[in-house]
Curated annotation (Swiss-Prot):
Upper classification of the organism: Bacteria, Bacillati, Bacillota, Bacilli, Bacillales
Protein name: UPF0398 protein SSP1297
Domain of life, per lineage: Bacteria
Family membership: Belongs to the UPF0398 family.
Pfam families: YpsA (PF06908)
Amino acid sequence: MIKTVYVTGYKSFELNIFKDDAPEVSYLKKFIEHKLKQLIEEGLEWVLIQGQMGIELWTAEVVLALKATYPDLKLGIITPFYGHIDRWNEQNQAKYNHIAHHADFVDSVFHSSYEGPHQFKQTDQFMLAHSDTTLLIYDEEQEASPKFFKQMLVDFMEKTNYTCDIVTFDELTEFINDLQWSQEQSFE
């Protein structure tokens, strides 16, 4: 049974999304909600993120909204190190702080500020060790930062019975097309 999922993927700028009110964000959040509801029906209790802008913070917003219907669902934010948002602009820092304030658990793997790239790798390993599955929104046709995690994930799965759901742009496009079609049908 899946009790804990780690959700990660592209940062917003890697998808060329620079505003939270972009239509793509709405579709991505609906897709994430769809995936999480499937897991909730199977017994999901915790959603973990590292607190990165993009897929992770959008996931956090979805989880916080789902808590109205699923009050036992919990959000955990496990950052690589202290101060990971210090270089973000004020608006993004405020968004993160609002989400963190409403999360059920917030901590850092390293209880220090940034020391080096090893912190990201060890945090990824921590997330794999403390979750039952990963929902990774990543398509090899558009390489970006998640490619390093994906390789670690594949290696980890070969050594364990860990599972994952790697979502490609084709799956996202199909979901969006179905969603748009159903919305059009409801207006007729």
